[in-house]
Curated annotation (Swiss-Prot):
The BAR-like domain displays limited similarity to other BAR domains. InterPro entries: AH/BAR_dom_sf, BAR_CBAR1/2, CBAR/FAM92. Homodimer (via BAR-like domain). Heterodimer (via BAR-like domain) with FAM92A. Interacts with CBY1. Pfam families: FAM92. GO terms for cellular component: centriole; ciliary basal body; cytoplasm. This is CBY1-interacting BAR domain-containing protein 2. It is found in: Cytoplasm, Cytoskeleton, Microtubule organizing center, Centrosome, Centriole; Cytoplasm, Cytoskeleton, Cilium basal body. The keyword Cytoplasm applies. Keywords: Cell projection, Cilium biogenesis/degradation, Cytoplasm, Cytoskeleton. Residues 131-153, 229-292 are annotated as: Disordered. Residues 266-280 have a biased composition (Acidic residues).
Amino acid sequence: MNVVLSRDSQVRAMENTVTNAERYFGQFCSLLASYTRKTARLRDKADQLVKQLIDFANTENPELRATIRDFAEDLAKVQDYRQAEVERLEAKVISPLKLYGAQIKQTRADIKKCKRVQNNEIKQLEKLEKLRQKSPSDRQMISQAETSAQRASVDTNRSTLHLVETVDAFQEQKLKDLRRIFSDFVTIEMVFHAKAVEVYSSAFQTLENYDLERDLQDFRAKTRGIYGHGEARPLTDTNPAPSVPWPLASQSAQSTMARQGKEAGGEEDSETDSVEEIPLEDLKGQQQGPRD
């Protein structure tokens, strides 16, 4: 009976391992999926900001218009990288975590089967003990009960050994996957933020280089010329704003506007749909990420 109790304790420990994996991996999957969705929403809001900056730039003088244009282009580039970040999180983090549902279900089925075999062994041993107490002289019945108990014990040993091997393989794979998934998560975030810092630095420098005094002088010259408060000085490079918006100069701005068009078509909830995965190393060598 001590052997039976020892095996039961062993199975309970393995069951706890699977239960904890089911609980925490499920929470990881849910939280990281929410993290990815919110990152996609942040990308969409930034796309809207880029669009508003473009519209605003078309109403301003050439100096400010050029500055805001370049600034918007940099923000659009960051959203390219953020789009790539979302795609990689889906492929490298969310999808592997989702696979654990099926693995845990199969392991639980193996545990349940092993427990049924153990319960049968306990019943056979209890039956044998009762026969020995009630009919100690009935050697035939006792012999049959001993045979059944021995057969049940062999089945239990075999089932327990199989379960130990199954849970051991499950635990090993779980540890490897845990390390790989979160390593990929950190790598994805580091690559995005490294690229974002690079582009944001360019955006900051664009704003620092903006000649506010020149723009203000141009504005004052125009307003004084209109209302006759003084002679307007000759202007250089102050052609009036074109009647149509300036063309989008980069693929980043074009892809931003394309995402805006998708949202207008009622597809704003599709930001977390999986797309073809782009290798992490590709992001490190490119200046802007794919979107569609």
